[in-house]
Amino acid sequence: CQAYGESCSAVVRCCDPNAVCCQYPEDAVCVTRGYCRPPATVLT
């Protein structure tokens, strides 16, 4: 799994239970859910 702030994907999950994989137009990173705002989307 990926640490906070590291790149992630729909397959590669985030280690931190409070983090989500946030897909920005150019990349996806592990951040807190509140930090992931449009136009970014949360990868489930």
Curated annotation (Swiss-Prot):
A single GO cellular-component term on record: extracellular region
Family: Belongs to the conotoxin I1 superfamily.
Free-text note regarding domains: The cysteine framework is XI (C-C-CC-CC-C-C).
Tissue specificity remark: Expressed by the venom duct.
Disulfide bonds: 1-15, 8-22, 14-30, 21-36
Record's keyword terms, sorted: Disulfide bond, Neurotoxin, Secreted, Toxin
Protein name: Conotoxin Rg11a
Protein source organism: Conus regius
Chief site of localization: secreted
Domain of life: Eukaryota
Secreted in keyword set: yes
Function: Neurotoxin. Elicits hypersensibility when injected intracranially in mice. May act via potassium channel currents.
One GO MF term: toxin activity
Subcellular locations according to the entry: Secreted
